[in-house]
């Protein structure tokens, strides 16, 4: 059977950067280590005045199409995942297609276009849609373009303000992929939750503590569901495990939970028994509260063991580098975690061919999804072609006052004019509104 997966990836980061420990923390009167050690964040990307989810998505897509030598005729489907949409009817994918048609011969007249919404998991759901479309044989030999693009902003003064970010990930989904093959097996954990939502509002309403609990619960359920179809997981089976990363500190909690689950009744638990005992079993406790207290105690000890620290450093830590420098990209965050891991492998000279990733996606509301990906022989060429470091180094640093101006510019409730901080070059830019209040864009050489 023909393999289907991610043939190529590209990113586009917001062109401005805010230094969290040195610029944001002092104004907020916070200890810088709250951000660097607690949240695991150092800098956040923000969009310039002329940037938004359309320009970032279109620019990432153009980089991908140019590198792969594609034209609109090669693309049969454009799916955009976002939770930053500005129109309740017209999908962002049509805007992005319109941008791309300005610079390529031909058009996307016969490409299916849509927009996915389920908080941050929508990017992975769009991958699933593209995968199923190709597997069903409905693609007519064409590839799918999946774009995850978001401007993740919180109300000023909100506790989540430090976890903001902006950027886009473009992925080409095709047969015989050059980067990773997606597994047929998937696992889900889904419940009706109100942990993070935006009911007719731009900025989220968040129950932070509840959101973390729901994230972990749904991830556990998704992993159990995945194992029901793919068989038991084990830490040694996966070279990297990219998680949805709203901030790296959240992944520390998810990784510990995952490691405990995967090592239960394994050689690793046997090896750890003399040091921290065996994992608590529910049947050994009279009440659920007693069982949970025992689990918490076990996990507190587990995270101090050499086995866990070594595994975390090898398998999890490399997935967090890009996120620590750009912040939360919502629908794109798990996909930059994948990119971060593979980039680390390339930098280390590691041969990833045939190795597996276990990818954990999450969206508030709430749903988690687990699937595996097998790295392809041509992965290194694809990863080395993505200019992550150059893009991040080229960002323009802003002051706290500048940050507040940019926040106001991208606040849908405010109308202010601010001079751009950077000069656009060879990219799509927002130019204003049309007669029906649609957003207008053009390509600047």
From Swiss-Prot:
Which residues constitute the catalytic centre? 83, 120, 244
Q: Which GO annotations describe the biological process of this protein?
A: acetyl-CoA metabolic process; farnesyl diphosphate biosynthetic process, mevalonate pathway
Superkingdom to which the source organism belongs: Archaea
Q: Does the keyword Cytoplasm apply?
A: no
- Enzyme class, first EC level, given as a word: transferase
List the InterPro entries.
HMG-CoA_Synthase-like, HMG_CoA_synt_C_dom, HMG_CoA_synth_N, Thiolase-like
Q: Does the keyword Transport apply?
A: no
Could you tell me which pathway this protein works in?
A: Metabolic intermediate biosynthesis; (R)-mevalonate biosynthesis; (R)-mevalonate from acetyl-CoA: step 2/3
Reactions catalysed, semicolon-separated, are:
acetoacetyl-CoA + acetyl-CoA + H2O = (3S)-3-hydroxy-3-methylglutaryl-CoA + CoA + H(+)
As recorded in UniProt, its EC number(s) are 2.3.3.10
A Pfam family per the record = HMG_CoA_synt_C
Positions contributing to (3S)-3-hydroxy-3-methylglutaryl-CoA binding: 31, 120, 163, 211, 244, 253, 328, 364
User: Mind listing the UniProt keywords for this protein, alphabetically?
Assistant: Acyltransferase, Isoprene biosynthesis, Lipid biosynthesis, Lipid metabolism, Transferase
Cite the pH-dependence comment. Answer: Optimum pH is about 8.5.
Q: How does activity depend on temperature?
A: Optimum temperature is 45 degrees Celsius.
Q: How is its activity regulated?
A: In contrast to bacterial and eukaryotic HMG-CoA synthases, is insensitive to feedback substrate inhibition by acetoacetyl-CoA. Enzymatic activity is inhibited by hymeglusin, which also blocks the propagation of H.volcanii cells in vivo, indicating the critical role that the mevalonate pathway plays in isoprenoid biosynthesis by these archaea.
Alphabetized GO MF terms: hydroxymethylglutaryl-CoA synthase activity
| Similarity comment text for this entry | Belongs to the thiolase-like superfamily. HMG-CoA synthase family.
Task: Provide the function of this protein.
Answer: Catalyzes the condensation of acetyl-CoA with acetoacetyl-CoA to form 3-hydroxy-3-methylglutaryl-CoA (HMG-CoA). Functions in the mevalonate (MVA) pathway leading to isopentenyl diphosphate (IPP), a key precursor for the biosynthesis of isoprenoid compounds such as archaeal membrane lipids.
Tell me the protein's name.
Answer: Hydroxymethylglutaryl-CoA synthase
Tell me which species this is from.
Answer: Haloferax volcanii (strain ATCC 29605 / DSM 3757 / JCM 8879 / NBRC 14742 / NCIMB 2012 / VKM B-1768 / DS2)
Q: Which gene encodes it?
A: hmgB
């Amino acid at each position: 059977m023909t393999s289907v997966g991610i043939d190529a990836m590209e990113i586009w980061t917001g062109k401005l950067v805010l230094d969290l420990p040195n610029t944001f923390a002092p104004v907020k009167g916070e200890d810088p280590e709250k951000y660097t050690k607690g949240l695991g964040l150092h800098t956040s990307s923000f969009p310039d005045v002329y940037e938004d989810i359309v320009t970032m998505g279109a620019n990432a897509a153009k980089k991908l199409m140019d590198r792969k030598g594609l034209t609109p005729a090669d693309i049969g489907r454009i799916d955009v995942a976002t939770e930053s949409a500005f129109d309740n009817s017209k999908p962002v994918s049509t805007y992005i297609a319109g941008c791309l048609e300005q610079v390529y011969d031909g058009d996307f007249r016969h490409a299916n276009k849509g927009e996915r919404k389920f908080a941050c998991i929508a990017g992975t759901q769009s991958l699933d849609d593209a995968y199923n479309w190709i597997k069903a044989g409905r693609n007519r030999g064409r590839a799918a373009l999946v774009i995850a693009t978001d401007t993740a902003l919180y109300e000023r003064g909100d506790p989540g303000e430090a976890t903001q970010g902006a950027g886009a990930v473009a992925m080409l989904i095709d047969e015989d992929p050059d980067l990773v093959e997606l597994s047929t097996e998937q696992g889900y954990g889904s419940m009706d939750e109100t942990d993070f939502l935006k009911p007719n509002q731009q900025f989220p309403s968040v129950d932070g503590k509840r959101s973390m609990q729901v994230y972990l619960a749904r991830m556990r359920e998704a992993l159990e569901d995945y194992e029901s179809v793919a068989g038991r997981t084990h830490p040694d089976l996966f070279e990297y495990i990219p998680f949805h990363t709203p901030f790296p500190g959240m992944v520390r909690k998810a990784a510990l939970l995952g490691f405990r689950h995967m090592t239960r009744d394994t050689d690793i638990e046997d090896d750890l028994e003399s040091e921290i005992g065996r994992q608590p079993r529910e049947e050994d406790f009279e009440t659920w509260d007693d069982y949970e207290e025992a689990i918490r105690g076990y996990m507190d000890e587990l995270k101090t063991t050499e086995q866990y620290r070594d595994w975390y450093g090898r398998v999890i830590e490399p997935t967090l580098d890009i996120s620590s420098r750009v912040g939360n990209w919502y629908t794109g965050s798990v996909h930059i975690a994948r990119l971060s891991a593979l980039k680390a492998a390339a930098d280390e000279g590691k041969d990833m061919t045939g190795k597996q990733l276990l990818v954990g996606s999450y969206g508030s509301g709430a749903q988690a999804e687990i699937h595996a990906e097998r790295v392809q022989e041509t992965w290194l060429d694809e990863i080395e072609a993505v200019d992550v470091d150059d893009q991040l180094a080229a960002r323009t640093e802003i002051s706290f006052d500048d940050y507040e101006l940019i926040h106001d510019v991208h606040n849908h409730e405010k109308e202010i004019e601010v001079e751009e901080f950077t000069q656009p070059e060879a990219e799509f830019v927002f130019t204003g509104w049309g007669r029906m209040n649609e957003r207008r864009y053009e390509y600047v050489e």
